[in-house]
């Protein structure tokens, strides 16, 4: 079983998130993509984070199609950090080939995540191009530190079979939706 893990606060979820998940599903030849809705992103302010139930409902609207699963596993596990979640899931499901999925905007700030180097060594990582983030992502501390482990995009279909560290940067049609922009419009309107 090849499973993509797409974590985020999804505050709110939007078509750009769906684009990332669908791109990963197709290009990585995954059986499932699990959207891990974070109870609270430790790098973001809690006062602007919508309630978990509201964000879960929003993700369900966008996580359509076969193989898309919405999960509050981090809440149930009491896990606040991706590295802890990955370790628990890998221990519980040793036969599953997990891939961490993120947008390029997340790779640009990945070095701020707790245990980011361990994440890269725990599971293969797929980075999906996002508008305005390509240069920052490709020159980020994480991209530089793990340049030796970057695979060509033509090998994306076998990334799940790789031993970490291994990562791929996938380009293609871009989706310009943004949670930040959506929140800005909602506060103004």
Swiss-Prot record:
Its EC number is 2.7.7.18. GO terms for biological process: NAD biosynthetic process. It catalyses: nicotinate beta-D-ribonucleotide + ATP + H(+) = deamido-NAD(+) + diphosphate. CDD domains: NMNAT. Keywords: ATP-binding, NAD, Nucleotide-binding, Nucleotidyltransferase, Pyridine nucleotide biosynthesis, Transferase. Pfam families: CTP_transf_like. InterPro entries: Cyt_trans-like, NadD/NMNAT, Rossmann-like_a/b/a_fold. SUPFAM superfamilies: Nucleotidylyl transferase. One of its GO terms (molecular function) is nicotinate-nucleotide adenylyltransferase activity. Pathway: Cofactor biosynthesis; NAD(+) biosynthesis; deamido-NAD(+) from nicotinate D-ribonucleotide: step 1/1. Catalyzes the reversible adenylation of nicotinate mononucleotide (NaMN) to nicotinic acid adenine dinucleotide (NaAD). This is Probable nicotinate-nucleotide adenylyltransferase. It comes from Caulobacter sp. (strain K31).
